[in-house]
């Protein structure tokens, strides 16, 4: 996975989160993609082309750990005219020097986090997927037996606006 922290995976955005199998967000759904990687002395360079988008899963009416009201996945919609066939793209560069590991990544395409709106019946929620651009940085520094970790992202989402987020930790 992308990222270094264990408590929150801010920058891990290629594969969609599976909230049915793992309400804590640890499990991911597979993602059809084309991945091109190039490795040299300046680091690992990766390009991802994502021709199809998998919607986030939510527990249904009979599912465990469901919210109220229930999310009706059959009513999902997209701001992109191509729906879930929008061609998303991502780039990642990772490298290390001595005790420092880092990675920079960028994703442009369908936002992995839908905005939930009440359906017309008022008893269920409708997931709406906008378009997003996200730039991320992850850093891990080793000091003796300690690992210091950080993830930072800047995101612009059609539905959720602009925001920054970060998480730090240690092992």
Locate each region found by the language model:
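Outer-membrane beta-barrel translocator domains and adjoining extracellular loop/strand segments
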Residues: 5-11, 58-64, 114-123, 160-167
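Outer-membrane beta-barrel pore domains and translocons
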Residues: 1, 50-52, 107-109, 142, ...
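Sequence/structural signature of outer-membrane beta-barrel proteins
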Residues: 17-19, 54-56, 111-113, 155-159
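Long, well-ordered mid-to-C-terminal structural blocks that present hydrophobic/aromatic surfaces
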Residues: 129-171
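Transmembrane beta-strands of outer-membrane beta-barrel proteins
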Residues: 45-47, 102-104, 148-150
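Outer membrane beta-barrel
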Residues: 1-65, 98
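Residues on the lipid-exposed face of transmembrane beta-strands in outer-membrane beta-barrel proteins
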Residues: 34-38, 91-95, 104, 137-141, ...
